[in-house]
């Protein structure tokens, strides 16, 4: 059972192929181990190069110059350039301080004050026995509220049913009066309308009564003895419930406005009258006046008013039971003028205690103020006879007197 050994040549041939296989396997294993670390090293080198490039580019951008101007410290700033001149440098010093033009406001007071600086025109001498007297009203500022109460009766001879005529003479330098606080339209009638109105007033009968629907303040320009001549008159109309026929078509605009007209800041320094007119007496409005016994206190009151208002050039402002009380001294008349005494009328049913007083002073010569000539110096002592028509209305009503004109 024993085998014989193989010859040595055969043994060598069989061992050579196994050795070759072992060498090839070892070489492949070593080759794989060498490639992996090389790949890792190559990847690390690439990453380092990329990081270095990023850092280099960042430093390069940081060293790049800034495009905007760098602000230096305030101590090293150069002096500023001279700017353009202000447009207000050429203005006066006062306006330069204000920084703008000072606008001057337009007001009625400024116009009246400018007109008052102008010299007063000389009025012509009167042809009658009474010398012309000049009455100047000096007021600083006051307000006149005119109300139209349709239920209050009145007693005056020359007052028509459509207009309440108040004649106040003023100089030509004040042709118009405006009201800043009023929303009314002021319409000035023509000369023809004024003449027609005066003609209708003179032709009105004595027993014609009733409160007017429109109140007219007529400012004459001086130079004529009476109010009958309307050639130089300027009309100032305050609106009422109804308008007179003498109003023009444009006067309808005042129908839609309020029932009162405020005249504030009226300067009447240049008011001229050809004869003494009397005094203005006023006090607070919207208060009731109790009824008084007119038989005992009427005549003394009228005599006191007549004596106190004629002795002064300036009108006397007096307080009478908290109502607007305005009395005008009558104009001069001839010796043959008729004296009429009218009855007083009082409305006790009214809540406002209206009292209408009418009185006539017969055979009384009016004393003249200082610097004037007494009427008896030029004519007979009985040349002048006056009448005083005194009307008291509540809450801002006006009481005026109108006298008869020579036919």
From Swiss-Prot:
One of its GO terms (biological process) is antigen receptor-mediated signaling pathway. Induction: Up-regulated in T- and B-cells following TCR and BCR engagement, respectively. Residues 1-25, 109-131, 331-388 are annotated as: Disordered. Residues 16-25 have a biased composition (Polar residues). Keywords: Adaptive immunity, Cell membrane, Immunity, Membrane, Phosphoprotein, Signal-anchor, Transmembrane, Transmembrane helix. Pfam families: LAX. It is found in: Cell membrane. Expressed in T-cells and B-cells. Phosphorylated on tyrosines upon TCR or BCR activation; which leads to the recruitment of GRB2, PIK3R1 and GRAP2. This is Lymphocyte transmembrane adapter 1. When phosphorylated, interacts with GRB2, PIK3R1 and GRAP2. The chain crosses the membrane at residues 34-54. PANTHER family: LYMPHOCYTE TRANSMEMBRANE ADAPTER 1. Residues 1-33 are extracellular. The keyword Transcription does not apply. Coiled coil: none annotated. The keyword Mitochondrion does not apply. It comes from Mus musculus (Mouse).
